[in-house]
Amino acid sequence: MIGNERHGLVGVIGADLIRNAKIPLILLVAVLISAVLVVTTAHRTRLLTAEREQLVLERDALDIEWRNLILEENALGDHSRVESIAIEKLKMQHVDPSQENIVIK
């Protein structure tokens, strides 16, 4: 007698799904896997975007530092240019410390 047997509801539903609904079950698993992959891809994209922003800020800071170094190099180059003009055109020369005269009022 079939009527006297007791089956668990979960077992009956599971057996019915496996027996009659294989394609929808496979599609459900595929959708779940796809959803997990979408979430992980979005997370990685956010992390990479944040890292890229940090690198852009670092690049900008390095660019500003490079420009300041170029300005400093040009300023130091101008000093040597002034010194060479003073020596060549004005016939100026460096004075030894022993030849210096200090005037005090």
Swiss-Prot record:
GO biological process assignments: FtsZ-dependent cytokinesis
What is the recorded membrane topology of this protein?
Answer: Single-pass type II membrane protein
One matching Pfam family is FtsL
The UniProt keywords, alphabetically, are:
Cell cycle, Cell division, Cell inner membrane, Cell membrane, Membrane, Transmembrane, Transmembrane helix
State which ranges are Periplasmic (membrane side).
Answer: 44-105
Kindly give the InterPro entries that the UniProt entry links to this protein. Cell_div_FtsL
Cytoplasmic side stretches: 1-22
GO cellular component term of the entry, any: cell division site
Coiled coil residues, start to end: none
Residues spanning the membrane:
23-43
Location in the cell: Cell inner membrane
Q: Which HAMAP family match?
A: FtsL
Function description: Essential cell division protein. May link together the upstream cell division proteins, which are predominantly cytoplasmic, with the downstream cell division proteins, which are predominantly periplasmic.
| UniProt family annotation | Belongs to the FtsL family.
Assembly, in brief, is: Part of a complex composed of FtsB, FtsL and FtsQ.
- Give the protein name, as stated in the record: Cell division protein FtsL
Gene encoding this chain?
ftsL
